[in-house]
C-alpha cells in the first residue's frame, strides 16, 4: 500500500546547521566547506541510488563547469581506481563538484548569523513504482514545482531495499537576476492595516488608503509613523512617514506553500497509482478521521530500539524502560 510522507525544514546558520554537510549526506559523498575548511564524509551511505542537480534558468552557467585539472586529480584517486564502473564514478564526481560549488556560493552571499541557507525536503516514493518511474515522476515534479520558479534543486533517491524508497531534496532560497547575479530575498513595502485574521483591510474611503498605479492589486491602508505626541512624523522634503516592513520578494516563504507543495506531490502520486491505492496529503483531522497519526522515527531512533530489543548495553534511560 502506498504511503504519504512529506516533510519540509530550513537549513540555517542560527541553528548551527551546515548546508554543505546536508548536501554531502543526501548525495552520500565528500564535500568541502570552503568557508570553514571542514570536510563532510558520507561515502559509507550505500543507499543513494540516484542523484541529480537541476539548475534554474538564471543560475550562472559557469557554476556547472568542472575544471579539467579536478577531473584528472579524481582519476588518479584510489576511489576512482577501485570503482567498478569508472564512467559512473566520474559522472557522480562531476555532479558532486557542481553541487559543492553551488552551496559554497550560497555561503558567500548568506553571511548573517540567522541566514537561511536552504530548504530541505524528504518525501516518500510509492514502492509500487520501479526505479525509472521514480526518477521520471520526481524529475517532472521538481522541475515544474521548484526549478521553473527560479530555484536550484539538489536531490537524490535513497533506497535500502527495505520498502522505504524516498527523496532528499535541497533547494536554494534566494532568486537569481536575469544577469545571473543573486537577487533579493526580501523587499521593503508598506505596512498595511490588517484585521484580526491577518488580512489587509479594504476601505477605499479611508484617508490613508493607498493604491499602486502600476499594480492596482497592491493596495491597502497605510499606517503612519507617530512621534511621542501622537503626531505623524515628517521625513525628507517634508514627506509624511509611513510604516514599512520587509516582505518576501518572491513568495517562496509563504506558509501556505508547504500545503501546496504537498498537494502537488500527492497529485503526481495519484496520477500514477491505481484508484484503490491513492494517497492523501491532508492530515487525519482534515480528512475527518478519528485516528492518531504516527510519528516519524528516523534511522537513529530505530537503531536505538533495535539495541534495546536485542538486550545490548545501552544508556540509562533505556535501562529504566526495560525494568518497568
Which residue stretches match the model-derived regions?
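N-terminal nicking endonuclease/strand-transfer module with a His-rich metal-binding environment
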Residues: 1-324
Amino acid at each position: 500500500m502506498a504511503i504519504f510522507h512529506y516533510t519540509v525544514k530550513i537549513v540555517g546558520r542560527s541553528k548551527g546547521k551546515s548546508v554543505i554537510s546536508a548536501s554531502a549526506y543526501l548525495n552520500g559523498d565528500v564535500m568541502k566547506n570552503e568557508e570553514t575548511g571542514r570536510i563532510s564524509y558520507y561515502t559509507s551511505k550505500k543507499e543513494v541510488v540516484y542523484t541529480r542537480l537541476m539548475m534554474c534558468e538564471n543560475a550562472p552557467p559557469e557554476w556547472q563547469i568542472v575544471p579539467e585539472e579536478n577531473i584528472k586529480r579524481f582519476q588518479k584517486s584510489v576511489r576512482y581506481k577501485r570503482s567498478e564502473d569508472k564512467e559512473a564514478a566520474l559522472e557522480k564526481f562531476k555532479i558532486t563538484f557542481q553541487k559543492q560549488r553551488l552551496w559554497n556560493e550560497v555561503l558567500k552571499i548568506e553571511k548573517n548569523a540567522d541566514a537561511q541557507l536552504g530548504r530541505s525536503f524528504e518525501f516518500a516514493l510509492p514502492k509500487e513504482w520501479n526505479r525509472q518511474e521514480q526518477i521520471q515522476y520526481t524529475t517532472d515534479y521538481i522541475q515544474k514545482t521548484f526549478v521553473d520558479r527560479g530555484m536550484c534543486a539538489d536531490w537524490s533517491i535513497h533506497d535500502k531495499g527495505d520498502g522505504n524508497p524516498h527523496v532528499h531534496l535541497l533547494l536554494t532560497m534566494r532568486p537569481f537576476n536575469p544577469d545571473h547575479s543573486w537577487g533579493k530575498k526580501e523587499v521593503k513595502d508598506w505596512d498595511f492595516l490588517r484585521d484580526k485574521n491577518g488580512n489587509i483591510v479594504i476601505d477605499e474611503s479611508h484617508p490613508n488608503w493607498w493604491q499602486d498605479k502600476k499594480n492596482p492589486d497592491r493596495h491597502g491602508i497605510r499606517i503612519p509613523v507617530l512621534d511621542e505626541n501622537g503626531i505623524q512624523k515628517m521625513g525628507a522634503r517634508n514627506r509624511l512617514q509611513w510604516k514599512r516592513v520587509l516582505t518576501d520578494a518572491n513568495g517562496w516563504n509563504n506558509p501556505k506553500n508547504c500545503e501546496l507543495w504537498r498537494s502537488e506531490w500527492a497529485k503526481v502520486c495519484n496520477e500514477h497509482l491505481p484508484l484503490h491505492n491513492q494517497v492523501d496529503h491532508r492530515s487525519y483531522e482534515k480528512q475527518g478521521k478519528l485516528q492518531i497519526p504516527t510519528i516519524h522515527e528516523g534511522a537513529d531512533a530505530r537503531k536505538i530500539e533495535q539495541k534495546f530489543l536485542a538486550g545490548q548495553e545501552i544508556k540509562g534511560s533505556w535501562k529504566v524502560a526495560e525494568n518497568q
